[in-house]
């Protein structure tokens, strides 16, 4: 009936990269190491930034060590790039969070460093991850006929 799959960063060494996503996705070594690098919301009205939490650039304050790594640098038009960021004197990286509708669910690839943010309690990281898990659920009616 459809579900969601969230894939967190991977290296392109030793895995079948062509099988990592239902659509074309090319992993790279692109990364943003400055944890204070400015984040731009490319798709501010996208569900992943609005339900159940309204994600703003403030949610990226207090991140530790880095923004993310192994961002894809090429992908199918089935994906929507959600964020843009870059280190000083680098080009913008737009592959840190990619969302694609797939069947009745969603496929999400993220290179964001949640594994660094969760242990130190970065609330914005938790809020964004909750949204990734909740995508597609905004208009679901529960078993009692009550719309969430």
Regions found by a protein language model. Give the residues of each.
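Sequence-pattern detector for short linear motifs
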Residues: 16, 68-70
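Extracellular ligand-binding/catalytic regions of CAZymes and related secreted enzymes
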Residues: 21-26, 32, 58, 70, ...
């Amino acid at each position: 009936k459809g579900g969601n799959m969230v894939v967190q960063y991977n290296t392109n060494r030793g895995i079948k990269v062509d099988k990592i996503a239902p659509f074309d996705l090319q992993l790279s070594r692109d990364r943003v190491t400055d944890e204070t690098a400015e984040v731009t919301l490319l798709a501010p009205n996208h569900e992943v930034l609005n339900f159940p939490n309204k994600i703003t650039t403030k949610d990226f304050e207090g991140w530790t060590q880095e923004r993310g790594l192994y961002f894809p640098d090429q992908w199918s038009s089935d994906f929507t790039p959600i964020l843009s960021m870059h280190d000083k004197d680098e080009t913008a990286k737009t592959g840190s969070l990619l969302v694609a509708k797939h069947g009745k669910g969603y496929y999400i690839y993220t290179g964001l460093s949640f594994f660094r943010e969760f242990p130190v309690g970065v609330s914005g990281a938790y809020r964004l991850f909750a949204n990734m898990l909740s995508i597609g659920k905004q208009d679901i009616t529960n078993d009692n006929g009550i719309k969430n």
